[in-house]
Amino acid sequence: MGTYEGWKNRATWNYMLRLNNEHAGYRAMCNELPLIAKRNRDSGRNAIIYKADAMQLALQIVGIITPDGSRAADVDWGEIAQAMNEILREMKRYGGDH
């Protein structure tokens, strides 16, 4: 399988696009990321976003299928978690959401 717009596949790109580029989704994600990281830290884990966290958050915001048909089952959740951790780092560095 090839890449799509720099992401592992179209579904991964599409889910992150909806999280990053739709105002309501972006605000929801930015509100939740620090809370998820804190919950992980408080439970003795690293204060990061794990694959399961990324999947759960994206499913809450986007759903199991995007409006144009990308399926959650096709998403590389590790890649989404990595992107969310980058956003979380930027939020910490610059304060609040960026």
What are these model-predicted stretches?
Residues M1-H98:
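Acidic interaction surfaces
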